């Protein structure tokens, strides 16, 4: 029963967020963009409305955007060339320049806290005798590589991502601000394989009823991540005609906006990450952020986290003490696999941001699932196991999901503006969603692109609905032709064949004459050079004689 209560809480919130109905032909109002009523309460476990979440995001957005650009939060470490652990496809790469990542090479431009001697330095005080843990995996009170002697807890298997990636000898330091997440053109069969593998991780082995609920929760987290990435790339899209980056409303509506459940899952993920940050707020106040950056960074973190509302999630209903350990272990293992699947992405920039965001969601799940509300020592133990890269990933992921929510509201304004200026054509476009016309369900799944380019899978609740139920396919022109039209078309084709054969025949007939002219011209040039007559003078003489 407790297991059911755990995941039922998630489902109540997620179900209230999602609207699985078909795309209606009725005009959208300002309170019903993408068929979501913003004044609707999210649910019994999420005592907050969409409108209130938008207000929270408006309050924290400017400060959060500045926070992730500070010296501490703008750098991340990962292995861009780690082999894919799931299939043997490690030689592929994206040839587009937009896929590349500019790694940190000029160390003089990097703050002291990110210098190699701080990142990779080891000494007796900074190495744990049992595990040999370096400063890069030090705890929150050692974020700047400071050496302190204190009793560390025994290692716990509570990680939802592979933290060893941060200490890999082949890992490189990247500046997230210098490598923004935007449309790269990466897609096709390989990217579809990536997302297919990610969604297939949502296959829990145990047959308990609670795992059906866990499957839905897992799906909404991944769907929210996928929809958020699609929103980012739609919001920062390269217009090949103007050469400028900007929002692409049509792409957003095709990938996200015409699917209310995807929009809802973005808000769902916003709530998950926001609650995780709110939950560790008391511990963040005791974190030291490196000398001159300490006060400024702490103030910005406080300004962001203090505005979060505890009503966004009621974890007392979601995370009980007697959660089935088998379910939680399976959930943890599968989400860790999701972070590892990112090593299979051929686009370096897509891989980088995929790693950052899956690390952020993994950190959120660790905080929400593993921090026991009734045990202060257990909570402190979980916080002590957080690495600085998990904290960096957590805040950058919150910035990404916050930017998605902000972009959704911006796309809403663009949507209504176009509806007012050209109601008939724009309305028909958004209702019909012609990007998917002419595709069968199988073709759509096989040829869809990843990140922004691959349409997200529909919610399982709508599997039994007609796939094109929301489309109004225009009547096709009859393919029957009259006898006169057929005769005319045949004559045109025969005439084209005749001219082609005539051209080939004339080429062969004129070949000897053309070869003779070529030989004489070369011989004339050679002879003039032999007798000492410059070619240039000879040409001038010919011109003069004319």
Swiss-Prot record:
Residues with attached carbohydrate: 337, 422, 449
Keywords: Disulfide bond, Electron transport, Endoplasmic reticulum, FAD, Flavoprotein, Glycoprotein, Membrane, Oxidoreductase, Redox-active center, Signal, Transport
Subunit structure and binding partners: May function both as a monomer and a homodimer.
Active-site residue list: 347, 350
Originating species: Eremothecium gossypii (strain ATCC 10895 / CBS 109.51 / FGSC 9923 / NRRL Y-1056) (Yeast)
The keyword Disulfide bond is annotated on this UniProt entry: yes
Binding locations of FAD: 182, 184, 195, 223, 226, 255
UniProt protein name: Endoplasmic reticulum oxidoreductin-1
GO biological process entries: protein folding in endoplasmic reticulum
Membrane topology term: Peripheral membrane protein
Signal peptide limits: 1-18
């Amino acid at each position: 029963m407790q297991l059911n209560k755990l995941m039922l809480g998630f489902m109540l919130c997620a179900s209230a967020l999602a609207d699985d109905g078909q795309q209606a032909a009725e005009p959208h109002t300002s309170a019903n963009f993408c068929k979501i009523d913003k004044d609707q309460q999210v649910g019994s476990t999420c005592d907050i409305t969409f409108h209130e979440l938008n207000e929270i995001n408006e309050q924290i957005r400017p400060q959060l955007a500045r926070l992730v650009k500070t010296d501490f939060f703008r750098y991340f470490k990962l292995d861009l060339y780690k082999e894919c652990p799931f299939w043997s496809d490690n030689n592929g790469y994206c040839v587009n320049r937009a896929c590349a990542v500019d790694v940190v090479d000029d160390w003089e431009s990097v703050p002291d806290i990110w210098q190699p001697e701080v990142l990779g330095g080891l000494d007796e005080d900074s190495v744990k005798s049992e595990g040999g843990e370096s400063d890069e995996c030090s705890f929150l009170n050692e974020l700047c590589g400071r050496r302190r002697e204190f009793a560390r807890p025994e290692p716990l298997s509570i990680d939802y991502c592979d933290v060893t990636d941060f200490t890999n000898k082949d890992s490189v330091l990247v500046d997230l601000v210098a490598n923004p997440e935007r449309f790269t053109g990466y897609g096709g069969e390989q990217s579809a394989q990536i997302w297919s593998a990610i969604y297939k991780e949502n296959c829990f082995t145990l047959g308990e009823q609670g795992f059906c609920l866990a499957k839905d929760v897992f799906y909404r987290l991944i769907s929210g991540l996928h929809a958020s990435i699609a929103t980012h790339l739609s919001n920062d899209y390269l217009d090949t005609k103007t050469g400028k980056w900007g929002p692409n409303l049509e792409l957003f509506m095709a990938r996200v906006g015409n699917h209310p459940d995807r929009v809802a899952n973005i808000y769902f993920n916003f709530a998950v990450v926001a609650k995780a940050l709110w939950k560790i707020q008391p511990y963040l106040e005791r974190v030291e952020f490196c000398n001159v950056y300490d006060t400024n960074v702490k103030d910005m973190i406080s300004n962001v986290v203090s505005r979060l509302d505890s009503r966004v999630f009621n974890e007392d209903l979601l995370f009980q003490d007697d959660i089935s350990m088998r379910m939680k272990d399976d959930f943890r293992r599968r989400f860790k696999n999701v972070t590892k699947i990112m090593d299979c992405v051929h686009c370096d920039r897509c891989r980088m941001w995929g790693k950052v965001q899956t690390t952020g969601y993994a950190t959120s799940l660790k905080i929400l699932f593993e921090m026991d509300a009734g045990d202060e020592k257990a909570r402190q133990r979980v916080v002590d196991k957080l690495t600085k890269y998990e904290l960096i990933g957590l805040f950058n992921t919150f910035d990404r999901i916050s930017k998605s929510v902000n972009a959704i509201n911006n796309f809403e304004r663009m949507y209504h503006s176009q509806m007012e200026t050209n109601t008939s054509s724009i309305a028909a476009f958004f209702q019909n969603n012609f990007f998917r016309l002419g595709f069968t369900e199988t073709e759509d799944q096989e040829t869809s692109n990843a990140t922004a380019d691959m349409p997200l899978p529909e919610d399982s609740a709508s599997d039994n609905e007609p796939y094109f139920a929301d489309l109004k396919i225009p009547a096709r022109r009859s393919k029957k032709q009259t006898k006169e039209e057929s005769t005319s078309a045949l004559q045109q084709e025969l005439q084209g064949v005749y001219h082609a054969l005539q051209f080939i025949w004339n080429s062969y007939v004129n070949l000897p004459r053309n070869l003779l002219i070529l030989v004489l011209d070369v011989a004339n040039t050679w002879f003039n050079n032999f007798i000492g007559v410059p070619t240039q003078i000879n040409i001038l003489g010919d011109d003069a004689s004319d």
